[in-house]
Amino acid sequence: MNNVKRLPLHDFHLSNSAKFTTFAGWEMPVSYGSSVSEHMRVREDLGFFDVSHMGEILIKGPQAIDFLNYVLTNNLNRIEDGQAIYSLMCNDNGGVIDDLIVYRISVDEFFLCVNASNAEKDFLHLQTLVEPFECSVSDLSADYGLIAVQGPKAINFLEELMPEYFSNISRMHFSKKEIWGETSYIARTGYTGEDGFEIFLPVSVVSRFASLISSSSLSTDTAWIGLAARDSLRLEAGFCLHGHEISEEVSPVEARLLWEVCLEKEDFIGKLALQKQLEDKTFGQVLHYEVMDRRIPREGSTVFFYENHAGRVMSGGFSPLVKAPIGTAYIEGDFLKQKQSPAWFAEVRGKLLPIKFSKPVLKR
């Protein structure tokens, strides 16, 4: 535990009865009571997430957009100042180094939010590639905390609480603001499938903001949401988690994330490999499923088509919305034409549980 990092709000969460787990090298709140109740609170009301473990990287300089268009799969020319876009960072083989959100401050300044488990790796990767470009790469991860407020009532809550900061920001847009004298970024983005904001705050004011939203909550129940509910929320929404649905061994083609890839760009790292994979047409795919049983297949469990080994589970959990286990699985290309067959199973402790492939819960 000596090398495990703690959030700036660690003691705050302790005082709110948080139970902790270790994730991506951080000691994180996994729940504050019932993770199912926390999940449904976000679906029906609103919830607060401390995701200060996420990494922040600033790219700045006259060739910042050229650099990012080379190292990322999406086209940064598609967005204007004040807009955000999802993208992937691939290796030469088309595998995904990380998935991230890019916030365009200006044509020569971009703010990246990257996964905590990859933050250091991403920063070093970008540093090794930036030399030919007239721009700089700065790691701001230690400088910023990140609080997310998500749910159908999140927008009204924050607009009423701090209207000067949260009004008139559209989805996938953000605003650079001075909050209590500190440069902050307020983004209408999220990882739950619900509307809401993600607020990047300097660590000097993140505690003040957390106390403000907590004391202003109209509910007597805790509004703070842990990692367990965050994972079930993203599974229902169909969002990928790096190291599961995507990795350096799983490409955007296989993960069905080509909407985050602009193959029309002149060049970017991984483009040739992705084009070749599409031409070969032998790739497997990541599919969402529901289990026809109460037991939950976990990551690494074998997926069978009849008695044939056909894939593996990448994520598994319980969906409070459909009240059943759901998950994702990588299915080998030879079996994809049979995905509507009723003869699919996932193995749990030697038992074969029937599964059916479907759209993510929130997209049905």
Where are these regions (language model features)?
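Acidic, proline/glycine-enriched N-terminal capping motif
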Residues: 1-87, 95-97
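Glycine-rich, acidic
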Residues: 6-10, 21, 27, 130, ...
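Short amphipathic alpha-helices in soluble, non-transmembrane regions
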Residues: 71-72, 124-131, 161-162, 209-217, ...
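Glycine-rich, small/acidic residue-mixed loop/short-helix segments
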Residues: 250-364
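Glycine-centered loop/turn motifs
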Residues: 81-85, 119, 167-176, 298-300, ...
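Helix N-cap motif at beta-to-alpha junctions
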Residues: 62-63, 115-120, 152-155, 202-207, ...
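Short glycine-/aliphatic-rich beta-strand segments at the starts of folded cytosolic domains
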Residues: 47-73, 140-159, 281-291
